[in-house]
A protein has these predicted regions:
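Positively charged n-region of N-terminal signal peptides that target proteins for export
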Residues: 1-4
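Bacterial N-terminal signal peptides
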Residues: 7-18
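Sec/Tat signal peptide C-region and signal peptidase I cleavage site
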Residues: 19-23
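Beta-strand-centric surfaces of beta-sandwich/beta-rich domains
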Residues: 24-380
Length: 380
């Protein structure tokens, strides 16, 4: 037997000594993998029922494909989708919905691309702990999604062209015992502002005195990520921005209004700060486990950016209600387009979601808002 430790073991010891967080992850995985599991793992997929290789389903215009329809108690652990669709805007035209325990209104409703962080309607690769987009057009979700009685997940084609090939694999843990009575259910809500209604277009740069002197203490006019009633906790958001004006879009502060408060008990210092970057993200893209800016566009009209953050360290709890918001520019002076999906867990029933905009209104387009870089003035 060799007396020296293998390079792999040495590496693991070094990482454990110098990275406590990663060491905790290793310990957690080791404990989980060495214990008997109390579930049966099941999968629902688009596999060819004949045993052939046509492992896909088509979705006709106006049609709805049910990708999951199973009884609980269970925990959905992984969703994988990929597709071929000729329509240019299919990521905005396909709508993902999830229903738990026989509810009539979905707990998840979002364009397919937006749910997976592709809020500008284009594919790009990125990875995080809970969502990723891999080569080539592979959409992955690892959000744990429990249900006590039943789960139904659908994909609806609101476009005008057929989706010829839609593939899916969904893995879930089936349990023999009921889930705890206080189990919270997964929710995701799409919102957009095309454009955000900035309060002025009479500015040249974000630091103009007119802008700097404006105050915003109560979140009036903020872009709303989500609103919820009941008990739960906010986990995070993926957001995309199409700039209608020149300059840095991210001067806005995040504000969380918990349980009906009039002043936010959680108030941030800037958009890139909330998404755990700094100083315009250094004008470069990045993608980490729980935060990132995988798309960082130029700071001008037409610039496109995508960002995300998950509150793994401390999900934001609420007992009665939550209103999660962010300014669009300082005190809401900018008029850029925002597209977002927020993710949270809460008790059922949930409050009503805002109506999903018609598909043609979900396509990202520059808007005539006036201001720097925007040639058409809008009334203010």
């Amino acid at each position: 037997m060799k007396r020296s430790l293998s390079p792999l073991i040495l590496t693991l010891i070094f990482v454990a000594m110098h990275s406590p967080a990663l060491a905790q992850d290793l310990t957690r995985w080791q404990a989980s993998l060495t214990q008997p599991q109390d579930y049966v793992l099941k999968r629902v997929s688009s596999a060819d029922p004949s045993g052939g290789n046509a492992d896909f389903r088509p979705i006709e215009p106006g049609g709805t494909l049910t990708v999951l329809d199973v009884d609980g108690p269970a925990l959905l652990t992984h969703l994988w989708f990929t597709l071929y669709a000729p329509a240019r805007h299919h990521l905005k035209e396909l709508v993902l919905r999830m229903y738990w325990d026989g509810e009539r209104t979905p707990s998840v409703e979002a364009p397919l691309g937006d749910f997976f962080g592709l809020g500008l309607g284009d594919y790009f690769t990125w990875e995080s702990e809970l969502l990723s987009v891999a080569n080539d057009r592979a959409l992955n979700s690892f959000f744990p999604m429990p249900f006590q009685k039943h789960a139904r997940i659908t994909v609806t084609n609101e476009g005008r062209e057929k989706v010829p090939l839609f593939y899916f694999n969904l893995d879930y843990r089936a349990y023999s015992k009921t889930l705890p009575a206080d189990t919270l259910y997964f929710h995701a809500q799409f919102r957009q502002a095309q454009p955000n209604p900035g309060w002025t277009n009479q500015w040249q740069v974000n630091s103009d005195r007119l802008v700097e002197e404006k105050k915003n203490l109560n979140g009036e006019g903020n872009y709303v990520w989500m609103e919820a009633t009941g008990r739960g906790h906010f986990l995070g958001v993926a957001m995309s921005v199409l700039q209608n004006q020149d300059g840095w879009w991210g001067e806005g502060d995040d504000m969380f209004f918990i349980d009906g408060e009039l002043r936010p008990s959680i108030n941030g210092t800037g958009s890139e700060d909330y998404f755990l970057g700094a100083f315009d993200f250094g004008r470069s893209s990045f993608s980490y486990r729980v935060f990132g800016a995988p798309v960082k566009g130029e700071e001008r009209a037409g610039g496109r950016s995508s960002v995300y953050r998950f509150h793994f360290d401390s999900p934001i709890p609420f007992s009665k209600s939550l209103r999660a918001t962010i300014e669009h520019g300082h005190a809401n002076h900018r008029s850029d387009n925002y597209y977002s999906v927020s993710y949270w867990y809460q008790s059922e029933p949930h409050g009503p979601f805002p109506p999903l905009p018609p598909v043609d209104q979900r396509i990202p387009r520059l808007q005539p808002v006036g201001g720097p870089g925007n040639s058409v003035a809008a009334p203010h």
